[in-house]
């Protein structure tokens, strides 16, 4: 995790612990963006446009990883559940970003 990400993500209680536990760069990037939105919810439309695509791709990765961990690599139940939650939550965030684009 870069120092800039660490500073931003640490400003929102609980997110840095999740990032540290999961050790997943894309999830950390999504959590950092979530922290930025919590801190300053006014998102420029050009930023929202780029983030919609990026976050949707991250959510897809999270869903695939969770399914993989549920069906093939069944060793880490806790991480699997966090990936499921991340995929759903990021998809919900993407839906909200799409709404503000209208």
Kindly label every feature range from the protein language model.
Residues 3-35:
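Short terminal alpha-helical segments
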């Amino acid at each position: 995790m870069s120092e800039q990400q660490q500073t931003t993500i640490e400003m929102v209680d609980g997110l840095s612990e999740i990032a540290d536990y999961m050790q997943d760069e894309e999830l950390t990037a999504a959590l950092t963006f979530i922290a930025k939105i919590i801190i300053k919810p006014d998102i420029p439309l050009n930023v929202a446009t780029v983030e919609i695509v990026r976050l949707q791709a991250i959510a897809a990765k999270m869903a695939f990883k969770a399914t993989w961990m549920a069906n093939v690599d069944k060793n880490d139940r806790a991480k699997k559940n966090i990936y499921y939650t991340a995929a759903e939550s990021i998809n919900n965030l993407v839906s909200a970003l799409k709404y503000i684009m209208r």
